[in-house]
From Swiss-Prot:
Pfam families: PRAI
The protein's name: N-(5'-phosphoribosyl)anthranilate isomerase
Record key words, sorted: Amino-acid biosynthesis, Aromatic amino acid biosynthesis, Isomerase, Tryptophan biosynthesis
Organism: Lacticaseibacillus casei (strain BL23) (Lactobacillus casei)
HAMAP family for this protein: PRAI
Pathway given in the UniProt record: Amino-acid biosynthesis; L-tryptophan biosynthesis; L-tryptophan from chorismate: step 3/5
Amino acid sequence: MVLVKICGLMHSEDILAVNTAGADFAGFVFAPGRHQISLEQALSLKQLLHPKIKTVGVFVNEPVAEILAIYQAGAIDVAQLHGKSTPAEITQLQQAGLKVIQVFERQAIDLTSMADYLMVDSGKGSGQLLNLKAIPHISRPLILAGGLTPLNVRQAVQLVQPTMVDVSSGVETNGHKDADKITQFIQQAKEDIIYEDIK
């Protein structure tokens, strides 16, 4: 069954929503943007999070030392790396105990990446859906992100068969996380796939 990451969590009610809906991963954005939170906020939110839900820190070209400081403070279990990351940097994070997600645009997936997961994204926070049929089937753990909503995630899972799906703005209403949309998204993503349904 596909795993689900809800990203861009900022408030206690967001945490309550992912706890109730049964997300697998919760994303905290440390990179600049409208979802950015501080280490202190992340630690407070993590205390409210169900212990089975892993936390992912989202970074854009962040120095390894800064990522490790956030990990060592206890805020994250996984580092999601946008921008340029060298194999040495990824290995350094992994040796410290972090799992690593490396983010690529569809045309530029590096199958030799040292990361634990490869994420295919249509662009940071763009809300645009990828051309799903153009995503190559790969044997590496793959995360699908970008433009997913409760209305299209089931078809996306059927077409791409990713390890995980990742959503942020697709479960928001007026710029805030919507508990009903989070529940619907997770239910649709994890629904048993009937391949005859694929058109």
